[in-house]
Amino acid sequence: MKINTLILILYSFVFFLYSQKLLAKYEITDPPECFNNKGETVKFQNMKSKTGKITIGIAKKDALGKPIIYRFNYDKSSKFLQKFIDYHECAHHQAGDLEKINLPLNSKDYLLREDMADCIATIRMKSNHLNAKNSILNTLKELKKAMKYIGFDELGIKRREDNILKCFNKNVSLKNFMEDIVKQKNIEK
């Protein structure tokens, strides 16, 4: 009887801790400076979803055709993941991805676009944070958990993690990396 009671108490305590983690609220960070490929300032708008359990960013054009990033449920993640998502979505504007046709989800070109945005975000995070390695590792930990939560398979999660780590280990400045991307995109035209 005492053992059953002890197990029940421990189980309840673990469940309580886990539920508190899901309910955790974080301070929403200020968005970074962001300009699109045309030099226009990208605006950020915080949004809340009552049912949303994870942080999501979406790069779009608003009703007037101006560049914007919608920041959903940023209070659900740490500053590391918030910054990474902001940088990733900003990268889509910087690279001119919104000027192109929408690509089929999970097509080769779509995945290359996402890899590039992750790479730009990683290099930007690396150049803007004193303890960059810790920032990236914390980001990856949260990002992998969120990806698993929304249904990504292990292979997709591992692929993204490997790309982010590969980009982190690049010895290149953000400015030079962006210049290379612009040159590459001009060649592809």
Where do the PLM segments sit?
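Classical Sec-dependent N-terminal signal peptides that target proteins to the secretory pathway
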Residues: 1-24
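Auxiliary, metal-adjacent structural segments of Zn-dependent hydrolase domains
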Residues: 20-64
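Sequence contexts marking disulfide-bonded cysteines in secreted/extracellular proteins
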Residues: 33-35, 118, 166-168
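Active-site scaffold of zinc-dependent metalloenzymes
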Residues: 45-79, 90-99
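Soluble non-cytosolic domains of exported or imported proteins
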Residues: 76-81, 85, 107-115
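Sec-exported extracytoplasmic/periplasmic mature domains
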Residues: 91-99, 118-130
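Post-HEXXH active-site segment of zinc metalloproteases
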Residues: 96-118
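Long, well-structured alpha-helical subdomains associated
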Residues: 127-189
